[in-house]
Amino acid sequence: MRSVKLFGLAALGSLGAAAPAPSRVSDLTKRSSTCTFTAASQATESASGCSEIVLDNIEVPAGETLDLSDVDDGTTIVFEGTTTFGYKEWSGPLIRFGGKDITIKQNSGAVIDGEGSRWWDGEGTNGGKTKPKFMYAHSLEDSTITGLSIKNTPVQAISVQATNLYLIDITIDNSDGDDNGGHNTDGFDISESTGVYIRGATVKNQDDCIAINSGENIEFSGGTCSGGHGLSIGSVGGRDDNTVKNVTITDSTVTDSANGVRIKTVYDATGSVSQVTYSNIKLSGITDYGIVIEQDYENGSPTGTPTTGVPITDLTIDGVTGTVESDAVEVYILCGDGSCSDWTWEGVDITGGEKSSKCENVPSGASC
């Protein structure tokens, strides 16, 4: 609850007896800047005027969003204890952030628990139960999300549409979904963003660790990804914004996942992928592809027929090393005629699997 509000009423009640001393007014102003809420409705409706918001063991009612997208500029949001959500089949999101110069963090031991097993049915967003998206970091500018511990999201975890946003030391643990029907549990989905910097993330899931669908000036570094579909660009094409530019994915590990490094563009769509660098990526236990780059996606699946409308240019693959399973493909490149160019391919050493016989239009310098 917002205890500072009670203090304010008490102070007003004392006005009839005597005017408060200046120090008391200063005290009141200071106290009223920090607000502690124990209910989602309190936080959503009463956040204005709070320079710091503490979310104390919030239980968000079924079918509602913990909406903190309209807080004052410069607000700090702190998660305390365990944040949970009531069950309902709906599209979500369960949490929404927005604003300028916002800091989002948690106190020691806090966890945001989606209890995703209530929705998991092996189908993700492809059918079955309607599952809520977890967190929208949309319309954030010059902001930081740091140290959050997120567990068992129903489907995709963090959707990013932001400008100059730092996400530091985020843990997303959906490993319970490995044997319980978790699907489409992407870690970070980025679109329509400029300046997104994800550092020190740990993601255990059943889909992309990171998926960049559009945006520029994006960095993912020091990440640890396991159980999912790897470090992905795309699929690019078929959206309102279909440009990916100036992306660096570096100093990260991918283990026990379907893919290591993946770039996919949409069949017969338009757009562009340029100035992308993957460097110092360590792979192990990869089951499908160590590196996969293909221009043939349609309705979420590869067609085997590449098109040229989303060229992949100025790509650097540098120091991608490690092992794949014996029946996995080490490197697969499927490009349209002339639509992959100006690639730099250095220090790639992936072993343990098969060589592909189906690569097409591999650009000069790359190997398949």
From Swiss-Prot:
SUPFAM superfamilies: Pectin lyase-like. The keyword Protein transport does not apply. Its EC number is 3.2.1.15. It is found in: Secreted. GO terms for molecular function: polygalacturonase activity. It catalyses: (1,4-alpha-D-galacturonosyl)n+m + H2O = (1,4-alpha-D-galacturonosyl)n + (1,4-alpha-D-galacturonosyl)m. Its main location: secreted. GO terms for biological process: cell wall organization; pectin catabolic process. This is Probable endopolygalacturonase A. The gene is pgaA.
